[in-house]
Every structure is written in C-alpha cells, then in structure tokens.
C-alpha cells in the first residue's frame, strides 16, 4: 500500500511540474506574440523608411477608420526632435513638426527650440519658426536673424528620411510592457554602436556619450491600427540625470484638420 501511495505522490508531483512548465511556456508565447504584434504594427510605417522625398507621402495612404470624414484623403504628421542636457537642471530640445495634407498637397509646420527646466516655473520659453515643404526642401517662412539657426532649419532632415529598419524583424528579446486599459504597448531593445541607425544619429547630432542606445517602440491606441492614438520611436542614449540624451521620431496618418 505504501508503494502505491508513493507512486501516486510521484505522479501528482509530475503533473504539477508539467502544468507549471506549461503555464510558463504559455506566458512566453503570449509575450513573444505581443512583441511580434508591436513589430508588425510599426512595420506598416517603418517599411517606408527611408523616405528620401517626403512629397511621396502625398501618394501614400495609411490606416483609415471611421474617424475619417467622407472624401478626406488624410494627413501625415511627422516629428523628429533631439533633446540633450548640456548643463544641470535644463534640457535643450529642438526639432520639427510637419503636416502633409493629402487633400491640398500642401505641407506646413514649424521648427521649435525649447528649454525644459527642472524648475517648471521657467518652462514658458518655446520658440516656433514656421516652415513649409517645397520641392522636398524645407522653406523658412519667418525671419531668423541667427544665421546658424537659419541654416539648421533649412537643412533639417527628419529621421524618417535616412533611417532604415530592414533589420527590425531581427531585433530579439525585447523588454515588453503592456497596459490593455489605456491601451498602450512598448517594446524596448538594447542596441550596440554598430547599429546602422545609431551610427547615423551619432554623425548628425552631438551625442557625447559612448553608451549603447536603448530603442523604444511605443504605441498608444489599438495595436492593430487606429487613427486615434499614436506610435513613437525613441533612441535613448543616456538617462543619467543632467546627461539625458534622446532622439524622438513620430510618423502617423490621421484625419485632416478642417482648417489645414
């Protein structure tokens, strides 16, 4: 009888181990599946990179849903910004926003220069300079006396114009964060300095740290596609206080503004 009880105990333990292992495997599959979904969601736009001629977007349509009015061809919104802490307590943030309206085939936006202070009472100093896109060139619409800033604006390139994500599917073992209530999804990858996009960013921007960059793919909204919400890319080179260094990129398709 004791022998039979021991056999029964061993069988029970074995079944428990299999069940626990199975649950762990299920979680791994779900996590892997979510990572794949995030990549696939981003691939819909990142497959277009690099967009050498931004005016090509007039002939490209993104995800459409019920938020679009009848006859609205939609508007592409682009943003690229670079932020860096050059002295304690303040982060310099510069970049450009551009709206490409597929109805009017006009592209307007602005270049912004901002300082973000630890002391929030000082955060009232963003400057904007109006721009438009003509023949795939940025045209400055405001008078800018600072010649260095003027050249920076007129020669500005969005990350989407030179980035290449053909190896996106090869990024592995990302740290996945999800919040189904918002909903929001994020995949985070540690890159090395030999990464193609990292090397390009180091050539263009004053990135002083030699640390490997962290790539974040962030989605707010339906992971399968939605004109409500957004997708954002971040290359974070340093999170150290007073050494923060980040590149942000945003390319989304949505309903057109009636006033645009």
Curated annotation (Swiss-Prot):
It comes from the Bacteria. Residues 1-22 form the signal peptide. GO terms for cellular component: plasma membrane. The keyword Cell membrane applies. It is a lipid-anchor. The keyword Lipid biosynthesis does not apply. It holds the Pfam family DUF576. It is found in: Cell membrane. A lipid is attached at residue 23 (S-diacylglycerol cysteine). InterPro entries: Csa, Csa_sf. Keywords: Cell membrane, Lipoprotein, Membrane, Palmitate, Signal. Its main location: membrane. A lipid is attached at residue 23 (N-palmitoyl cysteine). Belongs to the staphylococcal tandem lipoprotein family. This is Uncharacterized lipoprotein SAB0389. It comes from Staphylococcus aureus (strain bovine RF122 / ET3-1).
């Amino acid at each position: 009888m004791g022998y039979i009880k021991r056999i029964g105990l061993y069988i029970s333990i074995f079944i428990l181990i299999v069940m626990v292992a199975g649950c762990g495997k299920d979680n791994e599959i779900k996590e892997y599946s979510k990572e794949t979904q995030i990549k696939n969601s981003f691939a819909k736009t990142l497959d277009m990179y690099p967009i050498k001629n931004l005016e090509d977007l007039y002939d490209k349509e993104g995800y459409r849903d019920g938020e679009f009015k009848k006859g609205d061809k939609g508007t592409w919104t682009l943003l690229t910004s670079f932020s860096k802490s050059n002295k304690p307590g303040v982060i310099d943030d510069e970049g450009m926003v551009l709206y490409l309206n597929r109805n009017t085939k006009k592209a307007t936006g602005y270049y912004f220069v901002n300082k973000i202070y630890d002391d929030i009472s000082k955060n009232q100093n963003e400057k904007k300079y109006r721009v438009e896109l003509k023949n795939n060139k940025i045209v400055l619409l405001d008078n800018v006396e600072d010649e260095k800033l003027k050249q920076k604006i007129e020669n500005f390139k969005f990350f989407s114009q030179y980035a290449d994500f053909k190896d996106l599917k090869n990024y592995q073992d990302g740290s996945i964060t999800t919040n189904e209530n918002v909903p929001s999804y994020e995949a985070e990858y540690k890159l090395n300095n030999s990464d193609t996009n990292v090397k390009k960013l180091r050539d263009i921007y004053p990135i002083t740290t030699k640390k490997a960059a962290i790539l974040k793919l962030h989605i707010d909204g339906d992971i399968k596609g939605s004109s409500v919400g957004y997708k954002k890319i971040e290359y974070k080179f340093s999170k150290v206080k007073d050494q923060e260094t980040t590149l942000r990129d945003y390319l989304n398709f949505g309903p057109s503004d009636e006033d645009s």
